[in-house]
Each structure stands twice: as structure tokens, then as C-alpha cells.
Amino acid sequence: MLSKEPAEKMCSRSTGLDQEKVFSHKKLLSEASNEERSTTNSTIKKGIWYWNRASPPETRNSKLTMMLIDTHAHLDFPEFTEDLEDVLLRAKRTGVERIITIGINLKSSRKAIQFAERYPEIYASVGIHPNSASQEREDFLSELEELVKHPKVVAIGGTGLDYSRLPSKQESAEISQTTFGAADFHTIETEIRDEAEMAAQSAAFEQHLELAATVGKSIVIHQRDSWEDTIELLQKYSPRVRAVVHGFDAGPERAQELVDLGHFVSFSGNVTFINATEVREAAKSVSIDRIMVETDAPYFTPVPNRKKRCEPALVPGTAAFIATLRGMSLAAFAERTTRNAQRFFGLS
């Protein structure tokens, strides 16, 4: 059976690069060539320098003149229960004027709307995360159809396909920790459960796409180990929907595929990780008119704050890092990506 761990934990383990699996800076640099070490260190140092300028200390009362939008956060997760208002205040002080909080199931989506009603800077996206698809009730679409009518619901999702936690993957991981059998061993029964899980995710994803096309809202997509199937479904709906693949974790070729279909890519703090070479190449090359930035808070804290909880106030760090990669000023990059987010989510 699929894991019964909380949906928010499943989401954290399946968004982009698992934080647990990110190698240490020193280890990877020791294995890199001198040229690679020099280039990587230079980029990260520049990003940190810009981040320090872009992110004023909490004691500073004035906020930045630039405006940024955190296009993907999970403010309803337990990590923010105790200090959400402080989190929002810090975000404002760093120039993050708006935050899109993303539902991962019906309960989470309802809570996202409650936050959007309570706080003017918060907007909601409602949907069923792929890792929740087989656990959500079968008639979830009828409630989603009602939730999307709320004036502060600006998108549908997170939805998509995630093959990183299929039963066979979990079984292989368990076997690899024992002395019995090979890590890729799995049974026919497991294959059947894989197919059932993939079918549930695909059906839910297509229902979200159809709903987005019907109501005219953008769609927020989570993708993990499922590019071919994700692109195939997107191609079917691309003339009718506008999508963003959030927490982008692939290279420039995949980014260009999305842009060619008329969609967007959103980068989280994983672009700053030492082993995210392909992601950085995508961030450098993709059209500036198709980029957005996010935190995916509370996960994927950008360098140099890796040991801290991620929160919307850290968006300037990711924005500054990508701006440095592209040879842009932070102000210019913020202006362009904010404009993209406003257009995508229908914000004024």
C-alpha cells in the first residue's frame, strides 16, 4: 500500500530535489574540477552578496522599493502554525507583497482560501497534489468546482504527476536497506499497484486541466520523474490552458519544451543548491518572459540559509541568485518576474 504519512510530508519529499539528498557543499566541491569549483563558488558568492543586499535584517523597518511575488508556498502547513503573522511581516519587509498559498488536497485548499480571506497579501490555488490523488474522495471535483469560484482563488493546483513515490520505488528503497535482494526487485503485485497509482494521478491531473480550461484559470503543476507523461497531457490541453511547472528541477531542454507550448517555469531555492547544475542552466537560458520565482515554503531553503525553515521572505535570495546568473540587476529581474506572475495569476 502507499505510505500513509501526512500529505504535507509526502509533498515535501517529492518536490524537486529532496532536501535530505542534497550533498554537502564541501563534498561536492572536493569532487569537482578546479574550474567547476571556481565557477560554482563565484556564482554562489555573488548570489549571497546580492541576497544580503536584497534581504534586510528583521530589525530594519523600511522595506525594499521593488516588489516580488512568492508564487508557490504552503502557508497552511504545520511549520507556520505558531508564527504566520511574523512570517508575513518579514515577507513585506523584504519586498514580497503577495504570496500564492497552494492547496494539496480539499482540506488544504479550504484552508488556503481561509488564509486568503484573512490576509490581503495572500491568494489561493486549490487542487489535489498527485501524491494525494489516490487518497482523496472520488467526487473531489465537485467541491473543487465550488472552491474555484472564490474571488481570491487565482489558480488551480497543485496537481500533476509524481512517479518518485510509486509503490515499487518505496519497496526498492526498503529492500536496499537490507541484505536481501537487489534494490530494483519488485513483485507483479507491486507493478499492478504502480499502474493503479499512475492511473489515479493521471485521471486527477486531467480533471484539473479540464476544469482550468472550463473556468479560464491558470494551473500549477507538480512534476517528478514523469516528464514524458506530463508533457503528453499538457500538449493535449495547451491551446486551452496556461500552466506553470513549479519547483523546476530539470535542464534547459525541458524548460524550452514548456515555453514552446506557451507555459511558464518557476524556480525555487533548489536553483542555488551546489548539485543543481542543470537547473541553473535552465534559469540562465529560459525566456525572461516565462520565469517566475517561489519558495515552496517551508521546503527548499536557498543558500545561504539552508539550515533554516524556508519562508516567503527568502524569495529575494532566489531572485537575486538567478538575476546574477543572467547578468541582470535584482531590480530588473524582480520587475520582469513580478509582471509575469501578475499576468499568470490575473493579479493587478
Residue ranges of each PLM-predicted region?
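Mid-domain alpha/beta scaffold segments of enzyme catalytic cores
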Residues: 44-45, 49-51, 62-348
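Alpha-helix boundary/capping motif
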Residues: 10-11, 19-20
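Leucine-biased recognition of intrinsically disordered, low-complexity hydrophobic segments
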Residues: 2, 17, 28-29, 64
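Intrinsic-disorder-associated, low-complexity terminal segments enriched in Asp/Asn/His/Tyr and depleted
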Residues: 18, 25, 38-41, 50-52, ...
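Low-complexity, glycine/proline/serine-enriched flexible coil segments
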Residues: 6-7
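Arg/Gly-rich low-complexity intrinsically disordered repeat tracts
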Residues: 27, 34-36, 41, 45, ...
